[in-house]
Swiss-Prot record:
Organism: Salmonella typhimurium (strain LT2 / SGSC1412 / ATCC 700720)
Record's protein name: Lysine--tRNA ligase
Top enzyme category: ligase
GO BP of this protein: lysyl-tRNA aminoacylation
Name of encoding gene: lysS
Key word Protein biosynthesis present: yes
One cellular-component annotation, GO: cytoplasm
PROSITE patterns: AA_TRNA_LIGASE_II
Length: 505
């Protein structure tokens, strides 16, 4: 047996012994009828206590004679004979308990408290005071075991080191990792901030189907499921776009939805098959209006959630305070590949030659617009570090966007980039039903030619357009990627509570 295997075997034995001892303690508690009581009520959380009383002097606290009730998980314990110090962790953080034998009911300290384990959930009552080192603490007069933990916590000094274990056992990650807890608290604040921002601008939050007969609104490979009652194959949605625009046809002129999308594609540091998007649609607006709205949204969230418009990310600092850069797709190609002759991007053979020279395999089904987009992705995207809007996307890769009035080969569309990755996609919506029908047919032909991500023909949506869609602009923002930026997280799994994982065999 190797040294590593031997160590692993020893750890399993230690865990089994630890769990056996804890189960024996639980059995004893069951005999006493008190393993999982549900009659303890707290009146403060740790963060509330620190916010209210950290600034007070020891003498002032003593004079105030404040009694509080707290509850949480026992993370550390230092037993020093007749007295002990405990670190209690709750949703707000940590608070120290001072537990003295003579200040508790008879028998509680020796017969109960000293037999409890780290990870157990406790309820405590007592008076606030400050230790000689100035730490806010609770001098306990009542201490109760609320939940017996049968498994030990991760090592208190090293936490949960295995990255896979952090994702599979997120509950342990949240218990032992302050950074992880703060990431998901920030995510919650971002979502609340988005909703507040949107409602303040007259948008109505709605919900649209997660299972669809025809998946639409994006170019992606869908998940397929089966509806037994209808005996019908259905698709988990890849985007809510076509349903949201039906609502605009119906007269809801400003709508948004924050919900999950599903795309049956690869998993990477930037991609999870199940992810959260915010999509909005705004009647009597164009893509330029949404560029302004997007810039305002990100600037507002940075200031309100983080308290600054200077957001650190790795070695970079994103500046949301100054105006965001705006480039056309071709300008971006020229900027990051200066040797490009712009005229070559107007010619199929010349553009194909450029693409192949930088390692892009050009598929037979691609037209000029797709080739130029692939060149942009290859030479420019990774360099778009500071907040940047890219405009003038080819119509070929924008089947739902309105054609530009001056040049019908491009659309009134933008994508928003930060940190070298796309965060948002918006455009003036195509509201010409006949043009939309033809573009759907083009997508059907592309699918027949082997493009698995090409869109389906959605006849019902074309029918909706035939009733009249007002001039409208729409925007989609990837919430997970947004949270990555605001929390300095470098893999999407760090900002999704339960990311997709292969089952453990």
């Amino acid at each position: 047996m190797s040294e590593q295997n031997a160590q692993g075997a020893d750890e399993v034995v230690d865990l089994n012994n630890e769990m056996k001892a804890r189960r024996e303690k639980l059995a004893a508690l069951r005999e006493q009828g008190i393993p999982f009581p549900n009659d303890f009520r707290r009146d403060r959380t740790s963060d509330q206590l620190h916010a209210e009383f950290d600034a007070k002097e020891a003498e002032e606290l003593e004079a105030l004679n404040i009694e509080v009730s707290v509850a949480g998980r026992m993370m550390t314990r230092r037993i020093m004979g007749k007295a002990s110090f405990v670190t209690l962790q709750d949703v707000g953080g940590r608070i120290q308990l001072y537990v003295a034998r003579d200040d508790l009911p008879e028998g509680v300290y020796n017969e109960q408290f000293k037999k409890w384990d780290l990870g157990d959930i406790l309820g405590a009552k007592g008076k606030l005071f400050k230790t000689k080192t100035g730490e806010l603490s609770i001098h306990c007069t009542e201490l109760r075991l609320l939940t017996k933990a049968l498994r030990p916590l991760p090592d208190k000094f090293h936490g949960l080191q295995d990255q896979e274990a952090r994702y599979r056992q997120r509950y342990l990650d949240l218990i032992s990792n302050d950074e992880s807890r703060n990431t998901f608290k920030t995510r919650s604040k971002i979502l609340a901030g988005i909703r507040q921002f949107m409602v303040a601008r007259g948008f109505m939050e709605v919900e649209t189907p997660m299972m669809q007969v025809i998946p639409g609104g994006a170019s992606a490979r869908p998940f397929i499921t089966h509806h037994n009652a209808l005996d019908l194959d259905m698709y988990l949605r890849i985007a809510p776009e076509l349903y949201l625009k039906r609502l605009v046809v119906g007269g809801f002129e400003r709508v948004f939805e924050i919900n999950r999308n599903f795309r049956n594609e690869g998993i990477s540091v930037r991609h999870n098959p199940e992810f959260t998007m915010m999509e909005l649609y705004m009647a009597y607006a164009d893509y330029k209006d949404l560029i302004e709205l997007t810039e305002s949204l990100f600037r507002t969230l940075a200031q309100d959630v983080l308290g600054t418009t200077q957001v650190p990310y790795g070695d970079e600092v994103f500046d949301f305070g100054k105006p965001f850069e705006k480039l056309t797709m071709r300008e971006a190609i020229k900027k990051y590949r200066p040797e490009t002759d712009m005229a070559d991007l107007d010619n199929f053979d010349s553009a194909k030659a450029i693409a192949e020279s930088i390692g892009i395999h050009v598929e037979k089904s691609w037209g000029l617009g797709r080739i130029v987009t692939e060149i942009f992705d290859e030479v420019a995207e990774a360099h778009l570090i500071q907040p940047t809007f890219i405009t003038e996307y080819p119509a070929e890769v924008s089947p739902l966007a309105r054609r530009n009035d001056v040049n019908p080969e491009i659309t009134d569309r933008f994508e928003f980039f930060i940190g070298g990755r796309e965060i948002g996609n918006g455009f003036s919506e195509l509201n010409d039903a006949e043009d939309q029908a033809q573009r759907f047919l083009d997508q059907v032909n592309a699918k027949a030619a082997g493009d698995d991500e090409a869109m389906f023909y959605d006849e019902d949506y074309v029918t909706a357009l035939e009733h009249g869609l007002p001039p409208t602009a729409g925007l989609g923002i990837g919430i997970d990627r947004m949270v990555m930026l605001f929390t300095n997280s470098h893999t999407i799994r760090d900002v999704i509570l339960f990311p997709a994982m292969r089952p453990v065999k």
